Structure formats: structure tokens, C-alpha cells
């Protein structure tokens, strides 16, 4: 059994504020396959604060660099696709082929799509006598 004892918040791994964990059970054989932190509202608030603090830097990052970072994320997801699919299959009991196509494949496609969008989207557009700027507006959630 693996044990993941932290959540990645504000650039660091940290335990849940509660100090508690949740067993992850394989639905096929009902064996505990992992243990993860039991996140709390306090943990969510910390993550949202960290995301809000990161926004100015991300908003100031040139679109080409954002695209490169999103493409790098896509590449990591591609490299770990089998591992992700096997983990999801163990957690959910879904068929491996489905986990590869959907649970691992869709995030790869989304990250790639967003990378392409960041590289090609017109974030500044002339409309009549006006200029419309599109920029990150904030944390959702």
C-alpha cells in the first residue's frame, strides 16, 4: 500500500490541517490501496489563498511562456499516462482501456488544447475605436 501524506499547496507538500487521512479502497477486491490526507475547509482556504497570491505573476507571464508551461504539463501527463490510468482503474474499478482513454487521455487533450490556445489566441483585439484586452481575472471557486 502506498501512503500519500501531503497535499501540494503553495509550492510545498503539507499534511491536512486535521492530521487525518482517508483510506482509498479498490472496489474490485475491497483492499486498501492507498492512504491520502483528509482535506478540510481550512486546507481549501489555504489553497485558494495560494492561488490568489500566484495570480499576479501568472497574469504577467507572457502568453508564449504560459503556452510552454501548459505544453510541459501535457508532456508530463503523456509520460505518466499508463501510471495515471492504472491508478484510476485501481481506485474506481473502471476498465483500464477506459481509464487510459478518458481519465488519463482527456486531461492530456485539455492541457494540449489550452497550450495551443495560449500560443495562438489574440489576447488583444481592435473593435472599432476601442481595444479589447483579455487577461486572467482570478481564482475560480
List the predicted regions and their residue ranges.
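Conserved small-residue-rich beta-alpha loop and adjacent elements
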Residues: 122-141
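N-terminal Rossmann-like NAD(P)+-binding subdomain of aldehyde/semialdehyde dehydrogenases
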Residues: 1-128
